[in-house]
């Protein structure tokens, strides 16, 4: 055979093989009968709609090509996320809600999210189990720190903004350019600057001039609850905070509420309804609490007598655990 023709044939076969290797087929289910059309969107750089499909009898199919695996979602017309997965070559089965099977990266993510947690020693407490999970997730992330699996792991598997920032800084280009991370890294950095062991940052009310430093750093342990009357999770935490106040107030604990983006009348009504006995600072804004890397409430911080941050992000039983270590049962 003519050598030139042979070379051309080899190139054609290689190209055809590569094209076939980039193909994907997505088969998915939707529980909501009102969803008639679904949309496939990639999330690697900005948000780009790649395809759409009609839902028939709760099922849909999409086919296409992808150059390299990317984070993706299936959404409805209202942009509600129906499934979150990795778009990669191969056959991918999506089951509502949030189940993806097929493809090396999707299967690895499914193992991490569902199978690995079941393998952790069930006799460990929740904190130890969470730590064990995050250790394994970090190991997997470091093997995939510049691909779609690493991106999903960083996005979903770490609670601490300090850990997120540390791992983000170790990531490759896909991680560094992911829009959600780009917008969040400043918040993570502020959280890191006010993490456990760091000194307090002062906050002043524009309403009456009261300051956080009027209470913190004055020789007492101070438990500070950032909350609002319109926030149901905040109200759920209040009984535990009140109980901590009653139990430890004679043993050196000061409890303080910082009321965020709230109407004064609504806040006063909530204070009366829930029988909150400790002082409050009203007129605090989300812009102010962002200096602590807080992007949602409730957020509860325990300060040492010298103003050092001892614990933050306390919730539920964690409040009593932290205080019992200091004051005893």
Question: What residue ranges belong to the model's regions?
Answer:
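Bacterial Sec-dependent N-terminal signal peptides
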Residues: 1-28
């Amino acid at each position: 055979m003519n050598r030139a023709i042979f070379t051309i044939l080899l190139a054609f076969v290689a190209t055809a093989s590569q094209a076939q290797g980039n193909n994907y087929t997505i088969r998915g289910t939707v529980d909501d009968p009102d969803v008639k059309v679904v949309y496939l969107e990639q999330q690697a750089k900005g948000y780009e709609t790649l395809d759409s499909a009609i839902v028939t009898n709760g099922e849909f199919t999409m086919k296409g090509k992808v150059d390299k695996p990317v984070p993706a979602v299936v959404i409805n017309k209202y942009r509600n996320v129906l499934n979150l997965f990795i778009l990669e070559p191969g056959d991918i089965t999506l089951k509502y809600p949030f189940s993806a099977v097929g493809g090396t990266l999707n299967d690895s993510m499914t193992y991490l999210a569902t199978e690995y947690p079941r393998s952790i020693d069930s006799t460990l407490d929740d904190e130890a189990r969470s730590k064990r999970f995050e250790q394994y997730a970090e190991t997997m992330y470091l093997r995939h720190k510049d691909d779609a699996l690493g991106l999903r792991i960083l996005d979903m598997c770490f609670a601490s903004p300090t850990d997120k920032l540390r791992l983000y800084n170790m990531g490759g280009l896909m991680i560094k350019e992911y829009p959600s991370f780009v917008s969040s890294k400043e918040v993570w950095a502020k959280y890191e600057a006010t993490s456990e062991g760091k000194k307090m940052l002062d906050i002043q009310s524009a309403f009456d001039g009261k300051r956080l430093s009027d209470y913190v750093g004055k020789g007492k342990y101070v438990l500070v609850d950032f909350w609002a009357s319109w926030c149901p999770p905040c109200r759920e935490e209040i009984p535990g905070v009140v109980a901590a106040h009653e139990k430890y107030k004679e043993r050196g604990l000061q409890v303080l509420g910082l009321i965020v983006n709230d109407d004064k009348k609504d806040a006063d009504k909530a204070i009366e309804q829930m029988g909150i006995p400790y002082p409050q600072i009203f007129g605090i804004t989300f812009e102010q609490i962002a200096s602590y890397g807080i992007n949602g409430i409730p957020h509860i911080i325990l300060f040492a007598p010298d103003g050092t941050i001892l614990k933050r992000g306390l919730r539920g039983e964690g409040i009593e655990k932290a205080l019992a270590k200091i004051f005893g049962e």
